[in-house]
Amino acid sequence: MGDSNVDTGTTTSEMVAEEVSLFSATDMVLFSLIVGLLTYWFIFRKKKDEVPEFSKIETTTSSVKDSSFVEKMKKTGRNIIVFYGSQTGTAEEFANRLSKDAHRYGMRGMAADPEEYDLSDLSSLPEIENALAVFCMATYGEGDPTDNAQDFYDWLQEADVDLTGVKYAVFGLGNKTYEHFNAMGKYVDKRLEQLGAQRIFDLGLGDDDGNLEEDFITWREQFWPAVCEHFGVEATGEESSIRQYELVVHTDMDTAVVYTGEMGRLKSYENQKPPFDAKNPFLAVVTTNRKLNQGTERHLMHLELDISDSKIRYESGDHVAVYPANDSALVNQLGEILGTDLDIVMSLNNLDEESNKRHPFPCPTTYRTALTYYLDITNPPRTNVLYELAQYASEPSEQEQLRKMASSSGEGKELYLSWVVEARRHILAILQDYPSLRPPIDHLCERLPRLQARYYSIASSSKVHPNSVHICAVVVEYETKSGRVNKGVATSWLRAKEPAGENGRRALVPMFVRKSQFRLPFKATTPVIMVGPGTGVAPFIGFIQERAWLQEQGKEVGETLLYYGCRRSDEDYLYREELAQFHAKGALTRLSVAFSREQPQKVYVQHLLKRDKEHLWKLIHDGGAHIYICGDARNMARDVQNTFCDIVAEQGPMEHAQAVDYVKKLMTKGRYSLDVWS
């Protein structure tokens, strides 16, 4: 939209003269009447209709929050509460482990989802003797809170409450490859102190780019001694395996009440009702699934999901989340090795009747369904899982090894890192390599983490494709150090989703859309600089589609530059024809492609950015251009950011420190946006 201020050439004195001549007595009466009516309307008007705000990330909350977690703690005799902000389940898992630890010190703990409680109740926590609030807070995206911690974050920002007497500790979960490392954990720790709460142990900062599990164990083994010293308590014994859930086998149950993979409401896949979100995904039909690349070494694919009649709305730059299923071959092998009938209908019921979490996953269900849709069986299990399963190893040496890997000793940590993490051993591989380890399948299901949704940058614009969401992904497959071939859960599952389906059946994908801040500028005339090697090009396909659509509507569109990178032009140049067409029509002003393996010396996107430094600086400094980076966070995003800093320093010209500050200010102003992963 252009500016609405128009210079008519009328002077101030002329305007005053006109006003004097125009305002007669009649005009004044009418003017007074209008003012009176407006005043009446503002005072007595009804509440205006609510306007949906699409820029805010929508979250799924409980319909009624518990009135007081403090009252619940009093009622159940607990004095430690561990809140978790979790997007992938890891922070929730850590919170459960900490709450379970409490019994060793004569204390009782509970893990809690902040979305289910009123956190203003924190001020009442000192009413409980030796009370402690622990916060396991993950940072999502570019310094954002997780969905379930959004309300808590908003409350902290606005809170004007005295938390004197509240004792707390924070462990943050983040990734150092991201610009805002552990922003949420750091903010919660600092803000609670500002509100008067007392920190009883140092902030822990876990790094998922390194070894998050080891970071947590190291913090945890120092945290509990600090708790003991502060409250004057002592450990009552060694860590023990205490079951949280009891197994109930259903021998004669109506199949109509058995979960078959639904994430929330029973039979929700048979009777779909909006709104659709993480707890109520939409079953989208796969209408297109085509290979994008020519090479045989990797499989890069483009999928289109039909969202007609779902009322799902998305914008360019949003993410689509899909719930995958584990490979049936792995599930069958687990059943075989444990000698279990996977089709037994069962429930795992929480032994703590006061807990808000009645089951670890939707129950009643079958072991087959749980291992296929609800449990993560492909990632290396964490140390607490190894510790609890060790008791079922009949061979002493195997039991000793498992307990050692679960210990906090240097030797144990090193063994766990090399034998489990670096070798990418999942639970089936561990059972295969330790023949005497045969845990009951119900205990295994209790300890395994939940299978999480996978997020992809949407590769389409809703202006052009309002009834479909497009995905661009590369199938993950690699050989481990132990010689096994591991496959990506979601990408392998998506690859098999043929549009026609088997026997004419439709291929369905449970999905929902997560709003993002990765947005095109409000003004279409603003130049955009997009950098996206590999599948990082995905959101930019949507951006370019939208700008092409705006041009077709007769709108003026600013320069649109894409810096794309791949290995070879004849191997993995994604969307080659589409990009060429956009470039030919002028929707894509400049298309610069770096081929890393097509010549003796490797060429990456940052080399092309340096080549165009003068033009880029003009667009950024004079044209107010917005910069977008999508792809690998560990190397590419960092190198590209350094390249922009070099360009700013050289073209400014200015000192390097000033250039770094210049780029960071672009980020603060929303002119340098990242959609990256590690």
From Swiss-Prot:
<dbReference type="GO" id="GO:0050660">
    <property type="term" value="F:flavin adenine dinucleotide binding"/>
</dbReference>
<feature type="binding site">
    <location>
        <begin position="602"/>
        <end position="606"/>
    </location>
    <ligand>
        <name>NADP(+)</name>
    </ligand>
</feature>
<feature type="binding site">
    <location>
        <position position="424"/>
    </location>
    <ligand>
        <name>FAD</name>
    </ligand>
</feature>
<comment type="similarity">
    <text>Belongs to the NADPH--cytochrome P450 reductase family.</text>
</comment>
<dbReference type="InterPro" id="IPR017927">
    <property type="entry name" value="FAD-bd_FR_type"/>
</dbReference>
<protein>
    <recommendedName>
        <fullName>NADPH--cytochrome P450 reductase</fullName>
        <ecNumber>1.6.2.4</ecNumber>
    </recommendedName>
</protein>
<comment type="similarity">
    <text>In the N-terminal section; belongs to the flavodoxin family.</text>
</comment>
<keyword id="KW-0288">FMN</keyword>
<feature type="binding site">
    <location>
        <begin position="86"/>
        <end position="91"/>
    </location>
    <ligand>
        <name>FMN</name>
    </ligand>
</feature>
<dbReference type="GO" id="GO:0003958">
    <property type="term" value="F:NADPH-hemoprotein reductase activity"/>
</dbReference>
<feature type="binding site">
    <location>
        <position position="298"/>
    </location>
    <ligand>
        <name>NADP(+)</name>
    </ligand>
</feature>
<dbReference type="InterPro" id="IPR001094">
    <property type="entry name" value="Flavdoxin-like"/>
</dbReference>
<keyword id="KW-0285">Flavoprotein</keyword>
<feature type="binding site">
    <location>
        <begin position="472"/>
        <end position="474"/>
    </location>
    <ligand>
        <name>FAD</name>
    </ligand>
</feature>
<keyword id="KW-0597">Phosphoprotein</keyword>
<dbReference type="InterPro" id="IPR008254">
    <property type="entry name" value="Flavodoxin/NO_synth"/>
</dbReference>
<feature type="modified residue" description="N-acetylglycine">
    <location>
        <position position="2"/>
    </location>
</feature>
<dbReference type="GO" id="GO:0005789">
    <property type="term" value="C:endoplasmic reticulum membrane"/>
</dbReference>
<dbReference type="GO" id="GO:0010181">
    <property type="term" value="F:FMN binding"/>
</dbReference>
<dbReference type="GO" id="GO:0050661">
    <property type="term" value="F:NADP binding"/>
</dbReference>
<dbReference type="Pfam" id="PF00175">
    <property type="entry name" value="NAD_binding_1"/>
</dbReference>
<dbReference type="GO" id="GO:0005829">
    <property type="term" value="C:cytosol"/>
</dbReference>
<feature type="topological domain" description="Cytoplasmic">
    <location>
        <begin position="44"/>
        <end position="678"/>
    </location>
</feature>
<feature type="binding site">
    <location>
        <begin position="488"/>
        <end position="491"/>
    </location>
    <ligand>
        <name>FAD</name>
    </ligand>
</feature>
<keyword id="KW-0560">Oxidoreductase</keyword>
<dbReference type="InterPro" id="IPR017938">
    <property type="entry name" value="Riboflavin_synthase-like_b-brl"/>
</dbReference>
<feature type="binding site">
    <location>
        <position position="535"/>
    </location>
    <ligand>
        <name>NADP(+)</name>
    </ligand>
</feature>
<dbReference type="InterPro" id="IPR003097">
    <property type="entry name" value="CysJ-like_FAD-binding"/>
</dbReference>
<dbReference type="InterPro" id="IPR039261">
    <property type="entry name" value="FNR_nucleotide-bd"/>
</dbReference>
<feature type="modified residue" description="Phosphoserine">
    <location>
        <position position="63"/>
    </location>
</feature>
<dbReference type="InterPro" id="IPR001709">
    <property type="entry name" value="Flavoprot_Pyr_Nucl_cyt_Rdtase"/>
</dbReference>
<feature type="binding site">
    <location>
        <begin position="138"/>
        <end position="141"/>
    </location>
    <ligand>
        <name>FMN</name>
    </ligand>
</feature>
<dbReference type="InterPro" id="IPR023208">
    <property type="entry name" value="P450R"/>
</dbReference>
<feature type="domain" description="Flavodoxin-like">
    <location>
        <begin position="80"/>
        <end position="224"/>
    </location>
</feature>
<keyword id="KW-0274">FAD</keyword>
<keyword id="KW-0256">Endoplasmic reticulum</keyword>
<dbReference type="InterPro" id="IPR023173">
    <property type="entry name" value="NADPH_Cyt_P450_Rdtase_alpha"/>
</dbReference>
<feature type="binding site">
    <location>
        <begin position="454"/>
        <end position="457"/>
    </location>
    <ligand>
        <name>FAD</name>
    </ligand>
</feature>
<feature type="binding site">
    <location>
        <begin position="596"/>
        <end position="597"/>
    </location>
    <ligand>
        <name>NADP(+)</name>
    </ligand>
</feature>
<feature type="binding site">
    <location>
        <position position="208"/>
    </location>
    <ligand>
        <name>FMN</name>
    </ligand>
</feature>
<feature type="topological domain" description="Lumenal">
    <location>
        <begin position="2"/>
        <end position="22"/>
    </location>
</feature>
<dbReference type="InterPro" id="IPR001433">
    <property type="entry name" value="OxRdtase_FAD/NAD-bd"/>
</dbReference>
